[in-house]
Amino acid sequence: METLAKRLDACQEQLLELYEEDSKHLEKHVQHWKCLRIEAALLFKAREMGYAQVGHQIVPALEISRAKAHVAIEIQLALETLLQSTFGTEPWTLQETSYEMWHAEPKKCLKKQGRTVEVVFDGNPENAMHYTAWTFIYVQTLDGTWCKVYGHVCYAGLYYIVDNMKQFYCNFKNEAKKYGVTGQWEVHDGTQVIVSPASISSTTTTEAEVSSSGLTELVQTTDLYNTTPTPTTITRSNCDPDGTDGILYKDPTPTTPPRKRYRQSLQPPTKHLQHYGVTNVPVDPGSQRVTSDNNNNQRRNPCGNQTTPVIHLQGDPNCLKCLRWRLKKNCSHLFTQVSSTWHLTEKDYTRDSKDGIITIHYYNEEQRDKFLSTVKLPPGIKSCIGYMSMLQFM
């Protein structure tokens, strides 16, 4: 009993010294787990001999000591092989080699530089869960060698790549079954938001072909009229175990406001926006898009070759400002220029209404038609088509 107590005291004293040292050398952490293994073995032996207490130490049950010893042996052996690899000279903290880190997803791997990824289910910010994505993951292959890989985030989940194979350690589809109802979710990774292209195209988005690359770009309509500066730059997240790509939005970088301002000649203000020399084209209130007239004269340029097709959009100034921002970021290939927000005034220079107006210019009618068939305008935005001249003054 006395010998057992002395050995246990010496082991625990060494553990305290290691904790106080807080070393970043992997050799010290190997020694730490070796001490934990010896401590568990001594307590197991004491319990096996019938002791309930050794000194001031309460002796746990046999199964508890056995389980702790198995964990200590496993991690000690892993750290010893890591120490012999090229990553053994890297700085390692006690936390990075802890039991909690070893058994955190992905399990039985070493991880560094974790960050929080928020997943919002069913579009409800109140129904969100947090997950840990790792910047670096140290994986031991089947032949016992260690490799250092990057952790990745996509719409499907969290994963890393080893031997050209994606290994998912968190599947958001399974999480959506537990926490969601509709089976839809959004992934918020810092300033990036990844959403499902299937959910976008079936609800509030349309597809726009990118002529330069032949790729397809999805534009989320809700972002087109959201009054807060939400992420707008779109790229594809081509990683999904179920074959569903995600759409990645990044926060836009601040851009300088347009310097050139100009006035446009319009008829006196009425309830509906009118164009110089052009009759109004009705707007379908259900789709919020300009409807084409069957009369070919409406599609003919009435002012000669020095005019350009335009669309006037009228609505809340703040909504128009955000719409213009998102059009320039996401659909700049579908028009040539877009004006700043302007207003109609009465003869006494008072505003006719609080609504603002922006004007979008196009190379030709074909480009304008493509814009109309691609971009869905926000609710509350009135639109009508027409032609304008004197572009040389812009």
UniProtKB/Swiss-Prot annotation:
Annotated region (Transactivation domain), positions in chain: 1-201
Region (DNA-binding domain): 307-394
Entry superkingdom: Viruses
Subcellular location: Host nucleus
GO BP annotations listed: DNA replication; DNA-templated transcription; regulation of DNA replication; viral DNA genome replication
One GO term describing the cellular component: host cell nucleus
Keyword Protein biosynthesis (UniProt): no
Keywords, comma-separated and alphabetical: Activator, DNA replication, DNA-binding, Early protein, Host nucleus, Phosphoprotein, Repressor, Transcription, Transcription regulation
Cited SUPFAM superfamilies: E2 regulatory, transactivation domain, Viral DNA-binding domain
GO molecular function, one term: DNA-binding transcription factor activity
Region of interest (Disordered), residue spans: 226-309
Pfam families per the UniProt record, alphabetical: PPV_E2_C, PPV_E2_N
Post-translational modification: Phosphorylated.
Disulfide bond sites: none
Biased composition (Low complexity): 226-235
Job description of the protein: Plays a role in the initiation of viral DNA replication. A dimer of E2 interacts with a dimer of E1 in order to improve specificity of E1 DNA binding activity. Once the complex recognizes and binds DNA at specific sites, the E2 dimer is removed from DNA. E2 also regulates viral transcription through binding to the E2RE response element (5'-ACCNNNNNNGGT-3') present in multiple copies in the regulatory regions of the viral genome. Activates or represses transcription depending on E2RE's position with regards to proximal promoter elements including the TATA-box.
Family per similarity comment: Belongs to the papillomaviridae E2 protein family.
Subunit and partners: Binds DNA as homodimer. Interacts with protein E1; this interaction greatly increases E1 DNA-binding activity. Interacts with protein L1; this interaction enhances E2-dependent replication and transcription activation. Interacts with protein L2; this interaction inhibits E2 transcriptional activity but not DNA replication function E2. Interacts with protein E7; this interaction inhibits E7 oncogenic activity. Interacts with host TAF1; this interaction modulates E2-dependent transcriptional regulation. Interacts with host BRD4; this interaction mediates E2 transcriptional activation function.
Protein name in the entry: Regulatory protein E2
Species: Human papillomavirus type 32
